[in-house]
Amino acid sequence: MADINHDGPKADGSQMRERPSAKPLHLYNSEDAKKKVLELNQEEEDNKHEEKRKTFGRTPDGTVFIVPQTHDMVSQLLSPSQPKNLSDLAILAVLASLIFTLYICPTSARKPVFAAIFLFWRAAYNAGIGWLLEGQSKHNRLVLWAKNSHIFENPETGNNPHPTIYKLIKREMETKIPKDYKFEEAPLEYNTWLVFRRVVDLILMCDFVSYCLFAIACFNRPPESWLLFGLRWTTGIVLFIFNVFVKLDAHRVVKDFAWYCYHVLFISIVAHAAQFAFLTLVEEPHIQKIYNPPPPRRMRQNSEKFNPEDRPATAHSDATYTDTGVIYDSVRQPAPMHHIVGLQNTDFHRSIDVTVVLLCFYMFCLATVTPNTIAVRLFLFVHAFVWRLWYALGLGYILDRQSKKKNWTRHFIKHGDTKEEAWRQWKSLYHLSMTMCHASFGAAVWKMYELPSDWFLGLTLLRHVLGAGLLLLQLWTSTSIYDSLGEFGWFCGDFFFDPPSSNLTYSGIYRFLNNPERVLGLAGVWGLALITWNPPIFYLAATAHILNLAFLQFVERPHMQRLYGRKLRAESGVSKTLRQAMPSPVRNWQSAADDYVNSTVEFIEDLLEHARPKLAAGYETIVKDTTALFKTYPARISITRVPQDLAGLDPKQYKLEIEGTPSAPTVEIQKHGGREGELARTPATRTSEFKTLTFEYGAPIRVRWQAPVNHHKKDWIGLYMVTDNQSREVTRISSNGRWVATNKGVYDSTRAEDGILVSDRLVSVNSDEDEGGDCYTGEVEFRGDKLWWTTGVFEFRYHHGGKHHVMALSQAFEIRIARFDEDDVEVDANGTVHRAVEQALLPVIQNCFDRDPEIAPSTPEESFGSLVERDGKFAKRVVFAVHQMFGIEFAPEVVQADGNARNLAWRICNAKKILAPYSMSASRGRNTPTSR
């Protein structure tokens, strides 16, 4: 971003020590700006009273500025002490029109009218604002729009085509922020945010007011007892006050009903679902991107010699080891190679998965086929109760002994197995127990549930709605826990291995709650109890909850304290926020109550510790379900008709030339493998200098373009498979993000400019094919997500004016991966091809990791970057390449688990040796395995 004040101070050493004035301070880079902001904010906190303190912020380009004080939207609109501007009056007018609509609307039409109005504003909030924020998060779209439209530039420069709008926005913003703010000097990003905020204020206020008006429209007085009436109104008012608190404190919308009406309830559920989708699809990915970036690459010491003990541990390691490699420390977290949890990880080649599916099928048959008699109900109740006891007490006892004496691991080592085998067997046992615990409970619920004859009798419908909501809450909680902990934490891995880090990271749901499974983890159990409304099911739910609390208190909590000590967080994020909002007397009373409860718990712990030899007690662990995967949405360019502004443009003046990393010579040789007829076995004779272009898989490709001087600034170049387009004049398929603009600053997306190297360089053209004159040339680079990660024949297409009319085609080129031929490489000192596999694999892995120095290894023993574990696309690229090169298919988790090229090369050699007896080639092994 260009400097806002060109005459301002320059970023030298002295400037870093000076305090900036109200004008922004332009530093060289973001890191210098970050240090400067921390320094200035700390100085303000140390030397000034709270009312006189100023807050300093920074922009991505390194601009440091004073962040003016702003107020929440309710105070801005309704507080008489806050200055009002035209936008405030407009928002108040819209709110008044909503109230007036309720007044004049007929009673019979109020419900549908205000339901539609509320759903409109809710869609504007979750879909509209969500779309804007997603574009800003991924493509910086709002800031680019402001920059390209020049809407915030001073009209005196002659660049602003809308001086009236500029003056209006300037007056609005400076009226609203009278102190520490000047519109002309504020960074572009801050001014863009201020305008965006006014739009958000309008939508949020209309969303809230229209909801309240809809609730008023649905107001009624059902026939009920005064006790139920008072309880209902008290609960509703408390929830409403809490909603206002959350709205003012955190600017979020949490709405619940204060009147007994299913219309309000159902529309509240729709609103909550929309809000949840907004948080999941828009807010959470942005939070992870900004505040939880991948940690720096794990570095290891290089060594020249590698011991056999360092090889990756597998079930076949002792029998089939062929070479050496550096792997993980045996005392640390094991490599997660084949996950168990979730339907997407079900593998019927694994005995535990077959066992779980068969047992679940038996439970389904037991619940649906057997007669609904008292004896069958009693059997299913006892069956579910026994599984719950085993799941809580049995597994709890095993974990307690493992925590204190490592009994589980010692048992397997005693019989000649490894700690990795003990871990695998524990995961299978835990997974089976958890599944059967839930399946047996579900079977009991199915047998004891009776379909209501009248859904509107009493609380029947409400019970079913709340029960379904609690089920969804548990599913979401389990998914969030699994996303935060992974399978290592899901299966209590820190009971069996030292944790990867001595520091706890509170991410995902743990940012808000210390132990979400304490209450939310069993929400679905209570939901089913509400739906069935049966005493035995309530008894099972209460038993499950008590055992769960006991497990957390007496098994998990002591173990976590032994591992992390004082690093455990004493207060969750939600508790801290609510505590700060309470009055001082209430906070003091809560502290005293907490001390009393803690002392009581310690007394009970001591009592149980002395009685432990007599108690074989263990307790329940976390309840979770399948995990959900975030989807990314590639950019799309719509297919439109041929534009009308092509007159005067000659396609012959457009040209594309490509340059990439050529594939290995063996690729051309492997095309002719003796499979052809006799005449086709010799290389074809060429009558021209034309050569087939074959590039490496995943290597960046540069495209040099030429266009006339009057070419459209929104021209763009896309990458396509040759077979995907029938027409050579118009492209009729979307690029799916594989495109680069020819010029900067014409698209409201940073992704469009990613890859531009040179734009509109004026050159003279004098050749036999082109008439004399000038033209523009440029150069773009396709790499990473803008490439096709498969093999095939491709081409680049130059398109006109943001549309899909083709002006030029590049030469078609092929992406191929050379097969690794063991007969053409030299063996190492140990008589293996491990080193040759490493050398062949390393450049392929570097290409698969976008040649990014933060994640791509420079040597075979260097670890992959942390982003490889977070984003599965990198491992999938490597898996595809390995399959093409060596004919061996791995799961992506194997690449993530191995962690470097040397381990992966060892695994490839090991797999080839294991599979050699099954090869149909005589040179690779026997056709049928034989015993000696």
From Swiss-Prot:
Its main location: endoplasmic reticulum. PANTHER family: PHOSPHATIDYLETHANOLAMINE N-METHYLTRANSFERASE (PTHR32138:SF0). Residues 110-112, 220-225, 283-355, 399-428, 476-518 are cytoplasmic. InterPro entries: Phopholipid_MeTrfase, Phosphatid-EA_MeTrfase_fun. It is found in: Endoplasmic reticulum membrane. The keyword S-adenosyl-L-methionine applies. Pfam families: PEMT. Residues 1-21, 29-38, 301-313 have a biased composition (Basic and acidic residues). The chain crosses the membrane at residues 89-109, 113-133, 199-219, 226-246, 262-282, 356-376, 378-398, 429-449, 455-475, 519-539. Residues 1-88, 134-198, 247-261, 377, 450-454, 540-932 are lumenal. It catalyses: a 1,2-diacyl-sn-glycero-3-phosphoethanolamine + S-adenosyl-L-methionine = a 1,2-diacyl-sn-glycero-3-phospho-N-methylethanolamine + S-adenosyl-L-homocysteine + H(+). Coiled coil: none annotated. HAMAP family: PEMT. Signal peptide: none annotated. GO terms for cellular component: cortical endoplasmic reticulum; endoplasmic reticulum membrane; perinuclear endoplasmic reticulum. Catalyzes the first step of the methylation pathway of phosphatidylcholine biosynthesis, the SAM-dependent methylation of phosphatidylethanolamine (PE) to phosphatidylmonomethylethanolamine (PMME). GO terms for biological process: methylation; phosphatidylcholine biosynthetic process. It comes from Phaeosphaeria nodorum (strain SN15 / ATCC MYA-4574 / FGSC 10173) (Glume blotch fungus). The keyword S-adenosyl-L-methionine applies. Pathway: Phospholipid metabolism; phosphatidylcholine biosynthesis. This is Phosphatidylethanolamine N-methyltransferase.
